[in-house]
Amino acid sequence: MVLVFSDDKKLTLEMLSKGSELAKKLDKKLTAVVIGKSDDALAKEYIAHGADKVFIAETDIESFKAEEYTELLENVIKETGAETVLIGSNKNGKELAPRLAGRLNTGCVTDCMDLYLKDKKLTTERIVYSGNAIAVEQFNSKPQIATIPSKVFDPLPRDDKHTGEVVKKKFDVEKSASKILKIQEMKSEGVNVEDAEIIVSCGRGFKNKDDIKLVDNLAEILKGRTIGCSRPISADLKWLSEDHWIGLSGHKVKPKLYIAAGIS
């Protein structure tokens, strides 16, 4: 069985596309996991986008805690007998996947840009050395766990004729030793670079914050435009918020047009 999980619906839909391809080649079923309250509408959507089964792990967990989610997913994997596990590489997934691999004493490849079968083995490709090389790796243990960033694969077209099974099971997990005291939403400028079709991006080549107006002026000329930036502009200089941050450690984008100014 190929199992897919992310707490990000859009990322799950993207992973279901690659998961469906792998499941067919492995002659296995594709299962999407939902954690929390039963959500029949979400289950139906996942099935329409390629899932053969949706496993709803019902639990009273109110918010993400890595320890609790790790135990819960470990139980789901053992329950389903999944041999291939795809986890969304967002902030929660990056913490969850290695913990899960440790609990299951198995391998984990992170931020995969492609997955395929070679010599009957699951093979992964990921970017290393700041984008200067691609590492090609194979698993020698099961279950095999891989994380996938957003915007790597396109979701399958919705097919409401595709049928699937919905399984619901309640789980009790050991309460985490840590306690969430407060959740504070980060201030957002309402910028969504991940869905932008046209992006004008600036980097360290800009000497002054006021120079970013040049990028803003160009962006205004282009309809449907969004301003992006590299890590130094957001993380170091704080000239733009993290909403604009694009790159390996920032947002993953797939626009129709990308203009990079002052970025090496």
Model-derived features: positions:
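N-terminal glycine-rich FAD/FM-binding segment characteristic of electron-transfer flavoproteins
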Residues: 1-264
